[in-house]
């Protein structure tokens, strides 16, 4: 992930091909019930349910050898969130406030909350260490004011998620802002 770039889909035909050939193929790898549960947990700020679903997905879908770096988890989360493009503009590694957030969901509908996700990864982390990292991630969102972009777009309700990974384990802290 050394070279990041923003890609725009130039027209509806290309967007359709992208949706049908790429996103739907990826989405088929995740049971629909799991994808729906992950989405509902995100929309409601249910950190425990989101943790349970993500951990189950990690246990059943990935190799322990794949999971060493934050960039792996970033790609996994970005892939999961890409299927929400009908409800959200999914943004990754953008500058906002006084820093750069990991993931941002800018709602396309007024009734949906804005969502900011800050990811952390550690090798051989304990449950307590992961919980602390997740709390630190939420604090980072607040201190660096990552929600400025959402607020400027008129988003009134914003959820902050701190997500800490270690191997196939995950801890999540969420907070309404």
What are the roles of these predicted feature ranges?
Residues 1-145, 173-177:
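Extended alpha-helical interface modules used as scaffolds for assembling large macromolecular complexes
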Residues 149-177:
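Domain-level recognition of nuclease-like catalytic cores that cleave nucleotide substrates
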